[in-house]
C-alpha cells in the first residue's frame, strides 16, 4: 500500500539561490512535479552556505525518487550538483512492516 511520505533533500547548486529558485518555482517545474503527484512544501537556502539548498516535498512513497530518476538530466542543466544530494524520508506513523530493513 502506498502512503504519503515527506522527503527532505539537501544538495549544492552551482548558481545563486535566486537563479535556482526561479527555475524551481517555474510553471515547467510545477508541471514536472504534478506528473509524479509531488507537492513541494518548502525550499530554502542555508544561512551558512549560499550554495546549499533544502527542499521538502510530500508525495506518495517512491514518487520523489522516480521524479529524480526521470528528471536528473533536466535538474543538472539548472546547475544542481546531483552528487551532493542527500535525502531523508518522514511519515506520520509506521507499522512494523513499514520500518527498518
Cite the ranges covered by each PLM segment.
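Short S/T/G/P-rich N-terminal loop/turn motif that feeds into the first structured element of a domain
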Residues: 1-101
